[in-house]
Design a protein with these regions (language model features):
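Peripheral, non-transmembrane regulatory/ligand-interaction domains of membrane transport proteins
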Residues: 1-135, 141-144, 148-158, 211-213, ...
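Hydrophobic alpha-helical transmembrane segments and their immediately adjacent juxtamembrane loops
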Residues: 147-232
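Long amphipathic alpha-helical coiled-coil segments
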Residues: 126-139, 163-175
């Protein structure tokens, strides 16, 4: 299984390829077009590549696996670009936009990780069986493939940690803004409470309420409230 980025859904999807190796042939089976395999075929147009790849079934298998992992590596490029874009938007008052982009990134990283993790078991199994099938000469080639996979897995983990750190930072920035807004509303509530209370008192329909029955009672009460606001 190898990841291919879906630009419409903004997530990595899996492409599957089966490789059957016999003493004489290397057979690949896939159910849809695989760009990595097409690139491998086109590279055979160079005589030096063709000669090296077709030295034996082991060399051809090694060549195909290298191309597939190189393709998986390139599929990380869009993730690298998005991680860089998110990093640049931090601390620039784009918390909602950053949160949305991080959500897409986390989904893409999770799908990518699920797909490529199956490669580890396959490569390790091939390393064990390949030495028995092709001989000890194949060990160095298969270890090279495993090394490429480990490099890919480590880079993927670095991106996951970076995105997690960005998410924590963005959440802290959003919390700070929420606290500031809550503080502002608390101050406003405290400042307006005396006037709300004053208005409630003078709105009571009682005979002894002061100023209400005066000729200019409304304006007197309004002047008191405005003076109080200006005094604050």
């Amino acid at each position: 299984q190898f990841p291919v980025f879906d630009e419409i859904e903004m997530v990595s999807r899996r492409n599957e390829i089966d490789i059957l190796v016999t003493k004489r042939d290397v057979i690949t089976v896939h159910y849809e077009g695989l760009q990595a395999l097409e690139e491998a075929k086109r590279s055979f147009s160079r005589p030096s590549v063709l000669k090296e790849a077709f030295r034996s079934q082991m060399h051809l298998t090694y060549f195909i696996l290298k191309k597939l992992i190189e393709f998986s590596q390139r599929q990380l490029d869009h993730i690298d670009e998005k991680v860089e874009a998110v990093a640049k938007k931090l601390f620039k008052n784009h918390e909602k936009e950053v949160l949305r982009e991080i959500s897409y990134l986390k989904r893409d990283l999770s799908e990518y990780r699920i797909i490529v993790r199956s490669q580890e078991h396959f490569i390790k199994s091939l390393l064990e069986a390949g030495v028995k099938f092709w001989g000890t000469e194949s060990r160095v080639y298969l270890h090279d493939v495993l090394g490429d996979y480990i490099k890919l897995a480590n880079q993927l983990e670095d991106y996951r940690e970076a995105v997690s750190d960005f998410e924590d930072t963005n959440n802290q920035l959003m919390n700070i803004k929420t606290i500031e807004v809550a503080k502002t509303f608390t101050i406003l509530s405290f400042m307006t409470f005396p006037f709300v209370l004053l208005a409630a008192i003078f709105s009571m329909n009682t005979r002894d309420t002061p100023l209400v029955s005066e000729a200019h009672g409304f304006w007197i009460i309004l002047a008191i409230m405005v003076s109080g606001m200006l005094g604050m």
